[in-house]
Amino acid sequence: MKLLSCLRTALCLLGLLAMPAAAAYPEKPINMIIAFTAGGSSDVQARIMQKYWNKYAPQPWVFVYKPGAGGIIGFTEIAKARPDGYTIGGLNVPHIILQPLAQNAQFTPDSFKYICQVVNDPQCIAVRKDSPYQSTSEIIAAARKNPGKIRVGLVGPLSGHHLMFLDYGKKYPDAKLTSVFYKGAADQNAALLGGEIFGNINDVMRSIDEFRVLNVAAEKRNGFLPDVPTLREAGIDMVSDIRRCFAAPKGIKPAELDALRVLFKKICEDPEYLADMKKAGQPAEYMDGEAFAAYIAGQQAHAQEALSAAGLLKK
């Protein structure tokens, strides 16, 4: 009997040894969904990250572009993707908060599992270099004289640019600007260069070379534009930023989410990655996935208030 038991144990051990080892995740390329146009801010940042993903991960990314509607098309694709660990994507905040509050979106912030935040990008007011406007205050004064005549480009609707525009409208109801929406920053900037609009609400990175930045909507001056005053310095009490993160569809296996978080953290701590981000004008700021989920929850009240004041809150 004892001999039989030993034989059984030996056979079980042989069976385990014969089993193939579990494949390391990821074992095939990962689809990376970008919800904005190629060449825009989100794409530039993701391309830098891809370079270092290839340094640390065994499989590459396959970029999939789904631009339009302020990111809602791409965000929906991420939320609805099979949660098998092989589709992830870039998300923008406050976009993913605003859109479900104002529309019948097919996602909410709870539709995602957050890998990490990678960028905290303050917004700015930018004009062409030959623009007659030298400050945001001059634009406001001109808008008071000719309400609705000044056209401002936004990536939207229901984007971070749009939220800043709504905050402006609430603060300066007598200085109406007209918003013009674009699919991505590349389209928006081309429109400004072509004279289709008079100014942009934009991010700093996309404005440094081609435009004159009037003011930055941040608590303090931007390191890339140290001579440009903040809106508060100009007497305009507004702060606005866009946070960029990466996420997977809700339902991803915890082990795969953890693996992604480890890989992204390695990238975000890589000195060469940080140097490349700085060179590209991308304000890198890492926040882990759980902390970022808590940050999003804390932004709901502001988003609801802004949409309600503009009559855009979903009935």
Spans of features found by a protein language model:
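Positively charged n-region of N-terminal signal peptides that target proteins for export
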Residues: M1-R8, I201
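A short beta-strand-turn-helix
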Residues: A24-Y25, I139, A234
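An extracytoplasmic/periplasmic, membrane-proximal ligand-sensing/linker region
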Residues: E27-P29, K170-K171, P254-K315
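Short coil/turn segments
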Residues: T37-G39, V93-P94, R128-Y133, V155-S159, ...
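C-terminal lobe and pocket-closing loops
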Residues: D203-E269, G298-A301, K315
